[in-house]
Curated annotation (Swiss-Prot):
Gene3D superfamilies referenced in this protein's UniProt entry, alphabetically: Aldolase class I
Family, per entry: Belongs to the DapA family.
The name this protein goes by in its record: 4-hydroxy-tetrahydrodipicolinate synthase
Enzyme class: lyase
Length: 293
């Protein structure tokens, strides 16, 4: 199983292609600063605009770089086509990913029964652990707690959910109603509250910039030192907020470019760089922090 501190990796581009040299460097930085896992080709990795070949190559590279370290790979394998999700899941398993992150199918807005059948099909196609991913603001559909409970009972390898609905009532309800399904934060602004409610980790956007701080915040909480965790969470508050001033991953890539972690600032359309106003705000907030190489 994959728990603890994880970063939802960005995908760097150069001249409209994936910059794998920089990608490897960024993953090695995650290893250096004590993260427990990296998460390639999720929302932050612009998976929606990667080709199948690029998607698979990103997983392969992440697995290769992390091999031999303590850092695991939670590979993005989500799709709004169940057959495509199964294909990505099987590929990730074959190349050595430790677990899968599967977002709810987007755009086609399945019913709860459709979600159940989708996830069951993906989970039954593989042997490695599967983490559900609930982000209704992106997908237009939310996994109901009863559906998550049914999936946990029906599929032994569905072990956790990344919760990014932003509703603390759901977080508390998950702990009470589905205690055998691990809960992880999918939103940096509520990392601490979720960890304080028996969360088992975080999947962080901010961790791309501040892996050591996110690792420390998470590890302190998991060790029961909530005061230390809270202190770090408070220090990161302004950064967590500004990194969502526009659609993720637009601000995080801009911040990484300004911090010298990216060679250039490039997105795949329809994503574009931040507005001049937001770029200035990101720069202003970034100057308050020290970004380690």
């Amino acid at each position: 199983m994959v728990f603890g501190a994880m970063s939802a990796l960005i995908t760097p581009f150069i001249n409209h292609k994936v910059d794998f040299e920089t990608y490897e460097t960024l993953i090695k930085r995650q290893i250096t600063y004590g993260m427990d896992a990296c998460v390639p080709v999720g929302t932050t990795g612009e998976s929606a605009t990667l080709s199948h070949k690029e998607h698979m190559e990103c997983i392969e590279v992440a697995v290769a770089v992390c091999r031999g370290s303590k850092v695991k790979v939670l590979a993005g394998a989500g799709s709004n086509s169940t057959s495509e999700a199964k294909e990505l899941a099987l590929f990730a398993q074959k190349c050595g990913a430790d677990a899968l992150l599967c977002v709810t199918p987007y755009y086609n807005k399945p019913t709860q029964e459709g979600l159940f059948e989708h996830y069951k099909a993906v989970a039954n196609a593989v042997e490695i652990p599967v983490m559900l991913y609930n982000v209704p603001s992106r997908t237009g559909v939310s996994i109901e707690i009863e559906t998550a409970k049914r999936l946990r009972d029906a599929c032994k390898n569905i072990y956790a959910i990344k919760e990014a609905a932003g509703l603390m009532e759901r977080v508390v309800a998950f702990g009470a109603e589905v205690p055998n399904l691990a809960l992880l934060s999918g939103e940096d602004v509520i990392n601490y509250p979720i960890l304080a409610n028996n969360g088992k980790g975080v999947i962080s956007v901010t961790g791309n910039l501040f892996p050591q701080e996110i690792a420390d915040l998470t590890h302190y909480a998991l060790q029961g030192n909530m005061e230390k965790s809270y202190e770090i969470n408070t220090r990161l508050y302004e950064m967590n907020r500004i990194l969502f001033c526009e659609s993720n991953p637009v601000p995080i890539k801009a911040a990484m470019f300004l911090a010298g972690l990216l060679k250039n600032l490039e997105y795949r359309l329809p994503l574009v760089p931040p507005s001049k106003e937001n770029m200035a705000k990101i720069q202003q907030i970034l100057e308050k922090y020290e970004v380690k190489e």
